[in-house]
Amino acid sequence: MEKTYTINGIITFIPQRGALILIADETKTVSLNMPASRCLLLLIQQDGKTVARETFFEEVWIKHGSQVTSNGFYQNISLLRRAFKELGMEGDIIITLPRVGVRL
């Protein structure tokens, strides 16, 4: 059985499929690329704690044999923000703390 996470009672996240699904209308979905899906999973697992950029690099890319640049990291965070907005989430669900990290 696939592990799922509910975000703000509005969206279901299925990491194995890289899928964000609107709970109120399951026909509204957004597919994430694997790095973006791993970024979101890491944020969820940290339960509101700030995650350092270097931790993302290690957990999302390096452990999986990939290289990453700061630009690639920020592009994936931006992709997550757009996905949440596309599904109707208002406000900034992903918060960037300059020179510190990112939190959900």
Where are these regions (language model features)?
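Residues that recognize and position ribonucleotide moieties
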Residues: 11, 49, 95
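Short amphipathic alpha-helical recognition elements used for nucleic-acid or partner binding
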Residues: 29-60, 80
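Short boundary/linker motifs that mark transitions into or out of structured domains
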Residues: 1-33
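Short helix-coil junctions and helix-kink-helix linkers
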Residues: 59-67
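DNA-recognition element of transcription regulators
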Residues: 31-40, 66-85, 100
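Short, solvent-exposed secondary-structure capping/transition elements
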Residues: 51-52, 86-93
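A short linear beta-strand->loop->alpha-helix hinge motif most characteristic
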Residues: 90-104
